Regions:
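Acidic, metal-coordinating catalytic segment for phosphate/diphosphate chemistry
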Residues: 1-26, 96-97
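Short, charged/polar surface micro-motifs in flexible loops or helix N-caps
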Residues: 25-30, 39-40, 52, 82-89, ...
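Conserved Nudix-box catalytic region and its N-terminal flanking loop in Nudix hydrolases
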Residues: 26-74
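A short coil-to-beta-strand element that immediately follows conserved catalytic motifs
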Residues: 72-83
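Active-site-adjacent beta-strand/loop module that shapes the phosphate/pyrophosphate-binding cleft
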Residues: 83-116, 128
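NUDIX/MutT-family hydrolases
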Residues: 105-110, 117-149
Length: 159
């Protein structure tokens, strides 16, 4: 098999250890959280891996938002933040052997008001809009909680 075919087969088999985290919020700082279907009780913002090594991060962010919530409106903003974290052992089988860390890139998606959400039943069980501090407390992921706690800073910025 040519090396490019091996690379393509490899990327089709394993998740890419680069992802986006999208904090969906209203002007009043209400934040959308969704509950994982594979881990009931685990609440998070929209997140997902790149589909291809060359997929632009904003494209991945919009794709994940649409897939996981059905939301297709709002103003996406790259917060220019990234976190490298250890992949939970329960999910490491999704990545190539030896991959233990993921780099997560944070975006904010400002929506005009609380919007209805259409969940992918395969991925999520429920959704809730919460004030930003309560949303941060409910997140199972420390990096997700930390990103939400920075929301007021990013909403206050022009642009």
């Amino acid at each position: 098999m040519p090396s490019s075919a091996v690379s393509e087969a490899h990327s089709a088999t394993f998740k890419i250890p680069r992802s986006v985290l999208v904090i969906i919020h209203t002007p009043e700082l209400d934040v959308l959280l969704i509950e994982r279907a594979d881990k009931p009780g685990y609440w998070q913002s929209v997140t997902g891996s790149l589909d291809a090594e060359d997929e632009p991060l904003p494209v991945a962010a919009w794709r994940e938002v649409a897939e996981e919530t059905g939301i297709t409106e709002g103003k996406l903003r790259d917060w220019d933040l990234s976190t490298v974290y250890e992949i939970y052992p329960v999910w490491r089988h999704r990545y190539a052997p030896g991959v233990t860390q993921n780099t997560e890139h944070v975006f904010g998606l400002g929506v005009p008001h609380i919007l209805p959400v259409t969940l992918s039943a395969r991925e999520h069980l429920a959704s809730v809009w919460l004030p930003w501090q309560a949303a941060a407390e409910r997140c199972f992921s420390p990096s997700n909680a930390q990103a939400i706690l920075q929301l007021p800073r990013f909403v206050a910025l022009p642009g």
